[in-house]
Structures are given as structure tokens and as C-alpha cells.
Amino acid sequence: MGREFIPLFEDWAATYDATVHGADKQYAAVFKGYDNILDSIVALSGSNVLEFGPGTGNLTAKLAAANKKVFGVEPSPSMRKLAADKLSDKAVFSDGDFLEFPAPPFQIDTIVSSYAFHHLTDEEKRTAVKQYGAILQKHDKIVFADTVFKDHEAYDEAIKKAIRNGYHQLADDLKTEHYPTLGTMKNIFSEEGFAARFTQQNDFVWIMEAIKR
């Protein structure tokens, strides 16, 4: 369920914000256009938002600044504390993950996440989307930004390129986490009752907007 990655995020919490803004060159391409990507999620979101994996609260802050109500579900205690400190009383945060989480304290119309859905296996991704379909009403939506590959060949090439560049930590991440292909995500959303569109943001990240039919 992605909780095996909690130790990683406990260690990363203190330097995460620096990483997303380019401090670690290995991940510079992954986080290229980071603020614009988050702004796009905000623009596509409704008024009442359930956010999975808010991390240090960067997307949450943008959602709150746009006067959206946000319930954040974050499994990492260190990340959750940083987010709560950053947002003060502008959002509510709770322990949980993509598959096991408390009921939001209000009726949601949008589920969002940034740079986190790949912590689930493809089977778990399907289970999660099925769950969300049971929560959302018709025309409500899921808006996720995450690394997705056009096909398996593109995934393999990304690993080779990382190794060629000496980015061995990035290569290891690509090998060990559960990055999906576009085809996989299209099938999951379609088969679980969503009409989805995908917009590429950089060499790694796509925004997935899935509207419940």
C-alpha cells in the first residue's frame, strides 16, 4: 500500500522542499516546472478536496490559497508535521494512505495527489481508483500528477539515461517504485468508470484528470 516507503520520506522530509526546487540535480528533470504543475492541479480541482500524500504541504498550500477546503492524508509523521506547521489551521491532516484513510469531514468533489501514486503497485492503483469511484459523485474528479511512461520502452530508456548521466539514485528509484505506463492508467480509469485525459508536463510527469461518468 505504499507504506513501505515511509522510512524514505521520514529521511527526506527535511530536504524535500529543496529537492523539488532543484537542489538535487538527479531529480531536476522530474521536478521541472514543479510550481506550474501544482498550479495546474489547483486549476482543475473543485472546492472540496481530498489530498493523498501531501508531503510537506506544497500543493495543499496552493489549494488553500485558492479558497479550497482540503483534507490531507499523509502516512509519514515527519512530513505530516511539516505540512501542518506550514498550513497552520488552513487545512486538516490525518494519518492514512491511498487505500486506508479516514472519511473526510466534508463531502468531497475532487481527489488530488502529486508525485505519490507510483508508491502503489498497478493492482493497488486499480483498487484505489475503484474506492474513489465509490466516494465521488457523477462529474466529480480525480486529478493526479505523477511520473508515467508512454510505454515500457520509454521506461527502460529513462533508466538507461539516468545511468548514463551518473544518476544512480534516480535509476534505483525508477527500478524499485511502481511507475505505470499510460496504457495501464487509461485502462484503470476507463474500466472503473472514469473519462480520463492525460497532459504531459515534463520528461517524467503527466497530469491525469479523470472525471466520474
Swiss-Prot record:
**Gene name tied to this protein:** yrrT
Does the keyword Transferase belong to this entry?
A: yes
> In Gene Ontology terms, what is a biological process of this protein?
methylation
What are the transmembrane regions? none
Organism, per UniProt? Bacillus velezensis (strain DSM 23117 / BGSC 10A6 / LMG 26770 / FZB42)
Name the residues that bind S-adenosyl-L-methionine. 53, 74, 97
What EC number(s) does its UniProt record assign? 2.1.1.-
Q: What are the entry keywords?
A: Methyltransferase, S-adenosyl-L-methionine, Transferase
Q: Which SUPFAM superfamilies match?
A: S-adenosyl-L-methionine-dependent methyltransferases
Domain of life per record: Bacteria
What is the protein name given in its UniProt record? Uncharacterized methyltransferase RBAM_024380
**Role played:** Could be a S-adenosyl-L-methionine-dependent methyltransferase.
